[in-house]
Amino acid sequence: MKTIDYRGDTRTSKNQSDADGYSSCSTLKGDVEISGTYSGDLQLNGVKQISGGLSCDGASNMTGLSASSLNSIGDTFKLTGLTTLTTLSFAALTKVGSIEFTALPQLQSLDFTKGVTEAGSVVITNTGLSSLNGISLETVGGFDITENTNLKTVNVNNLKNATALINFAGNMDGLEIEFPNLGTGQNMTFRNVSSVSVPSLEKLKGQLGFWGNKFQSFSAPNLTETSDLIFNDNSKLSNISMPVLKTVNGGFQIARSDKLNVIDFPKLETVTGAIDFSGEFNEAHLDSLKLVRGDFNMQSTGNISCTTFDNMAKNREVIKGTETCKTTSNPETRDGKSGSTTSTGKASATSTGAASALDVSSMPAMGLAAVFGALVQYAL
């Protein structure tokens, strides 16, 4: 087997004969592009390595793509707009520079027999996939999975570290996500999922956010530190368990999660931004809290006790910003939006604790900061 060097050039396959021209080559140095006019199935036989990327854009009549011997793609594996593709078979593939699969509505499964264990990033959007079996990453940069409305389960069992955003949004409402061995990461955001399992997660450098999900319970038994922490509009959420969470390096918001009756973070000591809890809960326990650099807003329809938090605000000993704590029929978030699904969010007279507002400036959080920009505040 030989090596063909196409560095600085892109080889375009317009038909199977073009692809067969590579069959005597174990290594292709350069990029391989499949023509957007290709129709039917395409096989890349014999090739074991592509140093550049492998791509196909707009081949709406391509039905299958396979490469039984290919074990690595040095750059991006990019497939876009292959609207009739039903087969993607790469039995030996274990390493890619990155994966970008977009608009593959007929593709229901990945035939990656050995499993892709190395990828700089993964973006999968608007496909027919029901699972991500075949993606067996141990580490990854970004992991962005969106608009896959047939996606039922994601279990990346071997993943231990992520260095960029992990994002799930717009997939099947019943999507169940498992990262059983993920220990550290950057940012993680989840929308419209039915369960998230992160039993080994210990530390996030960025945010952890949940919006509009359907799960009843969330547990992070080993998480000690994260940046912004957000639970917003999770209508069925009745339990949050983070028994060893100690530090939130940013803002902490719980809002519009009306089934949540008790808020309890027994080991939480430090929040460097604002605390913003609103809803219909009856109890709130932050027994270890020593420092809140920003404002403190707690509003609920439930009969909450504010004595402890009022005392924390005295002389700015714990709460450095403005403290608002009250029972009200219209709980609001810190920025005046409705804090429960039954509240109006209209402005109303409030009583505040002893701490007056500091001259604070907003510091944008990492990742999707615009979603909750005003939440994160730091004392000057």
Question: Model-predicted segments: where are they?
Answer:
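Acidic, glycine- and Ser/Thr-rich low-complexity intrinsically disordered tracts
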Residues: 320-341, 370-373
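Concave beta-strand-loop units of leucine-rich repeat
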Residues: 5-21, 28-43, 50-85, 89-107, ...
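Short, intrinsically disordered, charge-biased short linear motifs at domain edges
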Residues: 311-314, 357-359
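Low-complexity, Pro/Ser/Thr-rich intrinsically disordered segments
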Residues: 330, 336-358
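Cleavable C-terminal sorting propeptides in eukaryotic secreted/cell-surface proteins
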Residues: 351-380
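N-terminal signal peptide
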Residues: 1-7, 375-380
